[in-house]
């Protein structure tokens, strides 16, 4: 299996579960609550790494900022209903030593993942440097997950973005978004669309994949779903080293499983994802250079 090297913004995800007691006598709208429990896990690129390790083992290596204070997202729940999110320390100090160490350790055959939450760990020049180093080596595959597409992403092997980012990059709203961004960026492109599936363009095959699926009646929330999609995709390629379409479908399965549980508290296991993949039901239709894939979901 390929080594997986990840660099990105390590965040902290905290979840506070509150029990309502009564209304505040000074303001009937406000609740008086008591804390029932709290969960804290690695978020951002840390969530990606946790799921990668769960899906494909321990040969996953992570570089992140070195500051004591990490950006923290605190989500508050009352009777399991998500009420609000509080963000703290939203910036990570850039450390050139982290970039130096990461670049120096990349080897032939590695999978290199750039998970950029735009908090400060990675700067544009770092992305160029990482991609350039990988181009000098043999069979290194580079994946970039970003909320903004910049010129520095030019030539990355796989660019994964969401639909909002794609529309920001190209002012269009149709299935050809992935193709246009691919031609502009010289990359394979994946555009995730949440519960509506994804669009992907495989540049060497010149093939557009439009993936749709049934509604997930067990949907809880989409927190961290982008990370789990990428974890599923990278882990499948690392384990099987072939098959972009199966890897994309597997990625959607992993994201689907993550949206059926609350937040980023629990990872998706290889056992659960492999079982779901084994029982997969899809239909395909090909029209010119576009492959339409629909997944049927058993919502029991």
Place the predicted regions along the sequence by residue.
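Residues immediately flanking
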Residues: 9-10, 163, 193
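Conserved beta-alpha-beta core of the PfkB/ribokinase-like small-molecule kinase fold
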Residues: 18-27, 72, 76, 80-92, ...
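Conserved N-terminal subdomain of the carbohydrate kinase-like
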Residues: 2-4, 11-114, 125-128, 272-300
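Short, well-ordered alpha-helix to beta-strand connector turns
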Residues: 2, 108-109, 155-157, 185-187
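Structural beta-sheet core signal
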Residues: 5-6, 62, 144, 191
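Short hydrophobic/aromatic-enriched beta-strand-loop microsegments
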Residues: 60-62, 158-163, 208-212
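Active-site metal-binding loops of divalent metal-dependent hydrolases
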Residues: 9-10, 117, 228
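Conserved phosphate-binding/catalytic region of the ribokinase-like
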Residues: 125-155, 168-300
């Amino acid at each position: 299996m390929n080594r997986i090297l990840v660099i990105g913004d390590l965040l902290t995800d905290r979840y506070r579960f509150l029990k309502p007691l009564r209304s505040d006598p000074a303001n009937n709208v406000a609740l008086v609550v008591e804390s029932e429990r709290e969960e804290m896990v690695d978020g951002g690129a840390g969530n990606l790494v946790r799921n990668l390790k769960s899906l494909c083992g321990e040969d996953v290596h992570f570089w992140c900022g070195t500051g004591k204070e990490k950006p923290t997202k605190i989500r508050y729940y009352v009777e399991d209903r998500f009420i609000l999110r509080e963000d703290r320390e939203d910036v990570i100090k850039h450390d050139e030593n982290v970039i130096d160490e990461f670049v120096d350790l990349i080897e032939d055959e590695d999978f290199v993942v750039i998970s950029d939450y735009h908090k400060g760990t990675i700067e544009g020049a770092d992305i160029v440097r990482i991609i350039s180093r990988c181009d000098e080596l043999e069979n290194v595959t580079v994946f970039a997950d970003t909320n903004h597409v910049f010129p520095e992403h030019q030539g990355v092997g796989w660019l994964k973005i969401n639909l909002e980012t794609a529309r920001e990059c190209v002012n269009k709203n149709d299935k050809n978004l992935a193709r246009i961004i691919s031609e502009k960026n010289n990359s394979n492109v994946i555009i995730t669309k949440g519960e509506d599936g994804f669009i992907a363009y495989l540049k060497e095959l010149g093939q557009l994949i439009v993936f749709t699926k049934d509604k997930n009646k067990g949907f809880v929330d989409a927190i961290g779903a982008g990370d789990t999609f990428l974890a599923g995709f990278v882990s499948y390629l690392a384990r099987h080293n072939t098959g972009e379409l199966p890897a994309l479908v597997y990625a959607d399965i992993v994201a689907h499983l993550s949206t059926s549980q609350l937040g980023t508290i629990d990872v998706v296991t290889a056992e659960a994802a492999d079982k779901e993949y084994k029982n997969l039901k899809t239909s395909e239709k090909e029209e010119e250079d576009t492959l339409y894939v629909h997944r049927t979901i058993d919502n029991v």
